[in-house]
Amino acid sequence: MEKLKNELQAELTQNIMPFWLNKMVDHRHGGFLGRIDGHGNPVPDAEKGAVLNARILWAFAAAYRVLGKPEYLEAATRAKDYFMAHFIDPQEGGVFWNLDAQGRPLDTKKQTYALGFAIYGLSEYARATGDEVALQQAKDLYADIERYAFDSLNNGYVEALTRNWQPIADMRLSDKDENGSRTMNTHLHILEPYTNLYRVWRTPQLAERIANLIDIFLTRLLNPQTNHLDLFFDDRWQGRRNIQSFGHDIEAVWLLHEAALELNDPNVLQRVEHAIKAIAKAADEGLQADGSMVYERWTDTGKMDTQRQWWVMCECVIGHIDLYQHFGDTAALDIARRCWHYTRKHIVDHEQGEWFWGCDENARPNLVDDKAGFWKCPYHNARMCLEVMERGPHPQPLSKGRGE
């Protein structure tokens, strides 16, 4: 475990963060560039996405909190200032979905997922620095989500709304998604920032919202027949249940566990720990003999998407490290190590820095998709490094063993 921690600290400090510090700062228009293509070429006129910028903020704030490097604080503050000046909607509240390169709003819809990541970044900045303005903005965005996006009739959070919080026809997060009004992905990335906000703002209402989100996962999103998390639903939680996303499954394992541990409610923790062991076992259906984890499977056709995407590798490492740390699962530690070794060999770009989007089943790197961009951010890989760095070298069981 110590060797893994040292390797990941070196990866973070010598490869990932220097790339974003040295190549992604937008010296002309402020903030950060919107895109570097798969070959490493900057695209100076690229749009700037809310998710990318919130994740940059989170990554540098978290890295500063853990390592205390002044250059990380400077970058985090740059990201925070730009986000609050340009992405926050001063008239209607919430967060713009994207901006042009000059910082002017393009798509003004309110995607709940983007508000979640804004809370994640701002709350981490407040956690790292004690900044009250960032914390207040995070609280305001939390209030926006609860006021406009929460459906008290059917429970759960709507996927997207117009700028002034009215229903919108196309709610999709990306063109790869189904147009469902409820998605597992958005609920996961509301649970995640709410947990982080709770670390710096411990209110009973927020605790209740986190507990409710956990319940949604265990009663609505978890498929009791497969133990995978289903992805797309309508307002009444009806869905096709035809896609199994191994990366989201293993990411949810540790984020659900983190939320339950932070709440510190024994009953909630017991329910979560029972569920995440089953979800982790289902996620491991995506593991390959080479140590990697593939992307997803369509159950109606049996087809497997065998891409090895960067973010899936990261979540595979964290999820299995969590199983090792809390349940003493040495097999999970071995899975995490092997996944990192595959990633280091085939997905880390040792020449130009950062990571490729991924590679195919023959380990050929994906040069078509971005090196940095709307969805390719220093979030999954920086967080993988930080999560392993912050965890102890030996198992620290906080609860009953995995075999219960």
Model-identified regions with their sequence ranges:
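Glycan-recognition and catalytic cores of secretory/periplasmic carbohydrate-active enzymes
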Residues: 1-393
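Intrinsic disorder/low-complexity segments
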Residues: 392-404
